[in-house]
Structures are given as C-alpha cells and as structure tokens.
A protein has these predicted regions:
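Surface-exposed, low-hydrophobicity beta-strand/loop segments enriched in small/polar/acidic residues
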Residues: 1-137
Length: 137
C-alpha cells in the first residue's frame, strides 16, 4: 500500500469503551463484570472467562438470540470494589473475579481483572483495570 497523499477520514472510537454482542437469554446488569462465553458473546462473568470489562448499563437479551443486543463495557480505568480479605497491606495485589460481582485476592480458577491501587477500608479498594493487559496476563 502506498503512503498517504491526502487526508483520510478514519472512524475513531472512545478508547475506554467497547461494544460486545450479548449471549442469548440473559441480562447483564449495570456495573457487572462482563466475560466472554468462549463463543464471542458477552455474559455476566463466570470464573475463568476472558474479561471484557465493566457494564456501562443494563442490557436485556432475555428474549433475543445471541448477538441481538450489544453491551457497552468500560475496558480500562479504576473502580471501587468490595474485595474479600482486602487489607491495607494489599496495595498492588492482583484482584480476581469469580462471578459478575464477587471479587477476591485468590487466583484459583478465577478471572484476573486488575490490581489494588488504593485501600479504602477493610474489604474495599480501588482496582485499576485494563482488559488489553489482563488478556496478556
């Protein structure tokens, strides 16, 4: 391909938002951790899923086929979460999710979602996340 000789209009997207098709017969709630069902469709995260991000709004695909609805997910940022066993000494610790609203410092079969950036109080911390980095982890 030759180098540009003129302006090109390119469709850019917001860097921290992605839209993903939703699995059939399910609802993903605002704030949920969203995972991949291994077929390319978003669902409420289950342990071991690929981490798509956090749901920006509720998406109801209960009566739809797979892909009829899309969900907007935040793919990077920082979020305050309840984390089982979190103490002030856990700054920098890896955080995992076992479902769409359960967070822990224990890896086992859970999904890595980010790292503790700030301790808020016992069992609550701010987690930084970036789905492109977690995908490579």
């Amino acid at each position: 391909m030759a180098t540009l000789a003129n302006d090109v209009q390119r469709p850019f997207e917001l860097g921290t938002i992605n839209e993903v098709p939703v699995i059939a017969g399910d609802i993903i709630y605002e704030g949920a951790v969203v995972g991949d069902n291994a077929s390319g469709y978003a669902r409420p995260l289950q342990a071991g899923d690929y981490f798509y991000g956090f749901a920006e709004a509720r998406t109801d695909n209960v009566n739809g086929a797979a892909g009829d609805q899309k969900i907007r997910v935040r793919t990077q940022g920082a979020v305050e979460l309840p984390i089982a066993g979190l103490a002030i000494t856990n700054i920098g610790a890896a955080v995992y999710a076992s479902d769409d609203d359960t967070f822990t410092l224990t890896a086992t079969a859970n999904t890595y979602i980010g790292r503790v950036a700030r301790f808020v109080k016992s069992g609550v911390g701010v987690v930084t996340f970036n789905t492109l980095i977690t995908a490579a982890a």
